[in-house]
Amino acid sequence: MKLTEEEKGIFTYFIPVKGMEEQLCKALTGVSERVEKGSETCGGNLIIQGGQGCGKTMLSTSIIKVLQQKTGKVDGRVGKIDATILNKKDIASMFSKIEGGCLIIERAGELTKNAAVTLSLLLEKDKKGTFLILEDSPKGIKKVLSKDENFAKKFTETVDVPIFTNDELISFARSYSRELGYKIDDMAVLALYNRISKIQRLNQATTLTEVKEIVDEAIDREAHGGLRKAISILTAKRYTDDDRIVLTEKDFE
């Protein structure tokens, strides 16, 4: 199975990651069945697991967008909530507000047993294709699935967001800057590799969030470049042929 070109565009940040397209195809197939059949299928809810800052919520929202296009469903509200807050809510009342839509539960490992049981029962009664996405680290996901067996059975689809290689982080940075109307030139890419190497730690992977912050900082520097910016405007080097603003090596130093 492969994603369409349009779907690849929606998942542009993640497609360069080895094995991600296959994971997404499998997950979309299972979740589509849940969305279309509702309580007629016991599974089809989704787990997205990975480290902090790896883009889990970004991936969740992209999956929802693709599902809306593929199925014409997910026409209810889409909500996002931290598990510790959800534990204190009237879960049945909240569920009724997102019927036919989706609820993204962040830090899902913090769900209480009572919350897990309640959500499981609500999913069993649901007729409108409401589905849930659990987000957490692998440890947090293991923790929440141990709370209630019936709840765990509802989550048959999983996407693992792996540790990004430096090349994949650079690919993300390029895609992110492109969406904002910028282009990272070749010398700037080398400077970005250098910035990434400086923040890498032995016991913790560099995250998409950290790389996003580096690009945001470069964009801010470009926008307030003073004399250098004035010269680049005069020499017409500030824009690409498709009118994107060029980020240079200096912007990343």
State what each model feature region is.
Residues L3-G44:
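Pre-Walker A (pre-P-loop) alpha-helix and adjacent loop at the N terminus of AAA/AAA+ ATPase modules
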Residues Y176-K183, L190-E253:
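C-terminal alpha-helical "lid" subdomain
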